[in-house]
């Protein structure tokens, strides 16, 4: 969340500079009276109409829409990438260097990477796939949604992840904790 705030302010999203964190803290302080809840699993809260806006993942929005439709609720959830950009993440698979049976891990990864399986995972989870071949079998409501499968201009506004040193992470966490606990 702090990366999004810093990016909105035109600052380096992974910064831990005192002046950047102070600016982010001031902005967060200004919006704090309007924040009612912090929660990392918004699907149920959205479907139960306990939230009017949520900062979350594209797949959460698709899952909320599916859940609402299954419950017979006529709700319309939409996912948007802020014009200033937002953080990007992706799932990855890795094999530990000391894995006892790396050949099985390779077989599993190869299985998952098959286009039909990638499409099935994408259709089930509501998250996009990076596989162009799999994309052909993705539900058209997802595949044709420009807020899920981003164009190049939108993709260019995404903030890539990178490691943040522990001391910097602690400084950033202090800002976030003060915001969540409504401390000045």
Please tell me what each predicted stretch does.
Residues 3, 21-29, 73-97:
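Periplasmic-binding protein-like
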Residues 53-73:
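A ligand-binding cleft/hinge motif common to bilobed small-molecule-binding domains
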Residues 49-52, 74-76, 104-105:
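Loop/turn elements at helix/coil->beta-strand transitions in domains of secreted/extracellular proteins
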Residues 1-50, 64:
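Extracytoplasmic ligand-binding site segments that recognize negatively charged/polar headgroups
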Residues 44, 152-184:
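Conserved C-terminal helix/tail region of periplasmic/extracytoplasmic solute-binding proteins
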Residues 96-156:
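Mature extracytoplasmic/periplasmic domains
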Residues 42-43, 51, 105, 118:
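Short, hydrophobic alpha-helical packing/hinge segments within bilobed ligand-binding/sensory domains
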Residues 6-11, 89-101, 120:
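A bilobed periplasmic-binding-protein/Venus flytrap-type ligand-binding module shared by bacterial periplasmic
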């Amino acid at each position: 969340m702090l990366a999004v705030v810093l990016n909105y302010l035109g600052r380096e999203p992974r910064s831990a500079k005192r002046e950047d964190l102070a600016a982010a803290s001031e902005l967060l302080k200004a919006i704090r009276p309007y924040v009612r809840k912090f929660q990392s699993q918004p699907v149920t809260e959205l479907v139960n109409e306990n939230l009017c806006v949520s900062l979350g993942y594209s797949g959460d929005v698709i899952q909320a829409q599916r859940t609402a439709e299954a419950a017979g609720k006529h709700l319309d959830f939409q996912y948007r990438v802020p014009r200033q950009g937002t953080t990007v993440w992706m799932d990855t698979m890795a094999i530990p260097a000391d894995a006892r049976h790396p050949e099985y891990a390779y077989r599993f990864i190869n299985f998952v990477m098959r286009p039909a399986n990638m499409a099935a995972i994408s259709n089930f989870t509501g998250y996009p796939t990076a596989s162009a071949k799999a994309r052909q079998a993705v539900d058209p409501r997802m595949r044709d949604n420009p807020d899920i499968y981003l164009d190049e201009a939108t993709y260019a506004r995404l903030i890539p992840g990178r490691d943040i040193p522990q001391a910097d992470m602690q400084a950033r966490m202090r800002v976030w904790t003060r915001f969540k606990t409504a401390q000045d």
